[in-house]
Amino acid sequence: MEVKKYIQENEERFLNELESLIRIPSISAKTEHKADIAACAERWKELLLEAGVDKAEVMPSTGNPLVYAEKIINPDAPTVLVYSHYDVMPAEPLELWNSNPFEMVIKDGRIWARGADDDKGQAMIQAKAFEYVVKNGMLEHNVKFIFEGEEEIGSPSLNAFLKENKELLKADIILVSDTSMLGAELPSLTTGLRGLAYWEVEVTGPNRDLHSGHFGGAVANPINVLCEMIAKMTDENGRITIPGFYDDVEELSKEERDMLASIPFDEEKYKAAIEVNALRGEKGYSTLERNSCRPSFDGCGIWGGYTGEGSKTVLPSKAYAKMSCRLVAHQDHAKISKMFVDYFSSLAPECVKVKITPMHGGQGYVCPITLPAYKAAEAGFEKAFGKKPLAVRRGGSIPIISDFEKILGVKTILMGFGLESDAIHSPNENFSLDIFRKGIEAVVEFHKNYKG
C-alpha cells in the first residue's frame, strides 16, 4: 500500500495512540510523577510491540526506566538505533493554556497538548514509519529503539546505561526526531546542536528577612546584589565576560556564514511572532548565527523575598537564580561550568555569601553531511516535502547526542520535524497535523534509502 494511503486510512488510530501517551503526565522534573513515568514507559512498550518489533522491554536504570525494542532482520545487516524520550516538561503556568495540557485537542490543523511535539508526537512519527515498512515488507536493515524518561532533566542516568549496554545498543547509525525545521515550507536537517551548562545560585545576606525601613540602605539586599552580579555576565557588545570563555569557540567559516545568510529569514516576522520590538545579542553576528552557532548566557529564573499577594516591605535574607550557557562545538561543558563557578563567585561583594550548584549539562554536536544515513534522511525530506532540506545548525541542546558518539562510537542523524511556533516547553504546545503526516512519509523514505 502506498504510504500516503496507509497514513490516511490509519490516522485516527495513530492519533488515538498518541492521545493515550499524552494523557499520561510523564513529567521527569517532578518526583510526584514517578508512577506516570512508569506508566508511559509501559505504554510505549505496548505500542512498539503493536508496531512490529520482535521484542520490547522496560529496562531499569539508576533513575527512570528506559524502553528498549528491536526488530532484527539479519544479524549481518546494518542497524538503525532510534532514540527518543517519553518524558515531558512541566506544564506550568497552567492558566496560560487554552486547554488541558494533558487532554489532546485537534484544532486548526494542529495537535495541542504537552508533548504534542516534544517528543511524543515526533516519537510517534518514528513508530508509525517503522510500522509501515514492516507491514509492507520493505525493511532491509535492523531497527532498535531506545526511549528514555529523563531527557528533559539532562539524561542523568543514560550515560551509565549506555556504558552497561554497549552490545545491546550496537548500531551503525542513530536516528533522532527531537529537533525542528526552519519552517513548514522550509524543511531542514539539523547538522549541529549547542551544548549546555546550567547552575542554580543562592545569595545570602542577613541571617533572616529584615524590615526594609529599619535596615534598608544599611544592609546589602541579596536580590539587588544578585541582579548586579548577573548584569556583569555580559558586556555592552553582548559577549560573555568569563575570562577564557571563548578560547575553544571555533569561528564560523565564510562558507557557513554565506549559507546562513542565504536562508530565507524575515526578522520582522520573527519579532512579531514573539511580540518583541527589537532583538539583542552578540555584536557582529546575525540573528541566525547568534541563536544557533554562537554561545549565549541566560538567566532562566530569579526569585527571593516576598512574592505573595499584596505588599510586604522586607529586605530578604536570600535570593536565588537559575542560569545557563548554551555552548558550541569544542566547548567542554564541565570546563565552562567550573569557569562560571569561579568567575561568578568572584563577582560577589564581601557583604553576601554565594553558593553555586552546577546542574545538568552536555556537549555540542556536529554531524557530517557526507554520511550515507544523512543522504537517506535528505532523500526522505525531499520526497515528503517536495524540496531538498537545508543543512543547518540549531540552537537547542540534546546532551546525550555527544555521548552516543563517545560511548557507542556512532554518529547521529537529527531528523526533526518541529517548528519554532510549536511552543515546546511553553503553554499551548502544538504540532502540525500536516507535518505529522509528512514526517511519517519522510522517515519511511529514510528506511527505504538507508543501506548502511
Roles of regions detected by a PLM:
Residues 216-237:
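A short core secondary-structure module
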Residues 86-88, 110, 146-154, 177-181, ...:
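Acidic, glycine-rich active-site loops and adjacent beta-strand->loop/helix elements
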Residues 183-184, 241-318, 326-342, 347, ...:
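An extended, acidic, His-containing surface patch that forms the Zn2+-binding/catalytic region
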Residues 188-204:
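Flexible glycine/proline-rich, aromatic-decorated loop/lid segments
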Residues 1-94, 318, 335:
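N-terminal helical capping/dimerization or prosegment-like subdomains
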Residues 77-147, 438:
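Active-site metal-coordination/substrate-binding segment of hydrolases
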Residues 117-192:
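Acidic/histidine-rich catalytic neighborhood of metal-dependent amide-processing enzymes
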